[in-house]
From Swiss-Prot:
Disulfide bonds: none annotated. Gene3D superfamilies: 4.10.410.60. PROSITE patterns: RIBOSOMAL_L35 (PS00936). This is Large ribosomal subunit protein bL35. The keyword Heme does not apply. PANTHER family: 54S RIBOSOMAL PROTEIN BL35M, LARGE RIBOSOMAL SUBUNIT PROTEIN BL35M. The lineage of its organism: Bacteria, Pseudomonadati, Myxococcota, Myxococcia, Myxococcales. InterPro entries: Ribosomal_bL35, Ribosomal_bL35-like, Ribosomal_bL35_CS, Ribosomal_bL35_sf.
């Protein structure tokens, strides 16, 4: 039986962790210094976050060899 392939789009956007959670980077940070974003908006966009359980289930299907 051939090896299952990981979805390349998911590979670029998400990181499955050993704990079973899926880490991602927030959208809208390409141009953080853009005019129109408040300090609070920029602060909340910093860093990474984990997906909700419902979305996590869908994304995990894209990673056949992740736990």
């Amino acid at each position: 039986m051939p090896k299952l392939k990981t979805k390349s789009g998911a590979k670029k956007r998400f990181v499955p962790k050993k704990s079973g959670k899926v880490k991602f980077r927030r959208a809208g940070v390409r141009h953080l210094a853009t005019f129109g974003k408040t300090k609070k908006q920029k602060r909340h966009l910093r860093g990474t976050d984990h997906l909700t359980p419902m979305d996590e289930k869908k994304i995990k299907e894209c990673f056949p060899y992740a736990r």
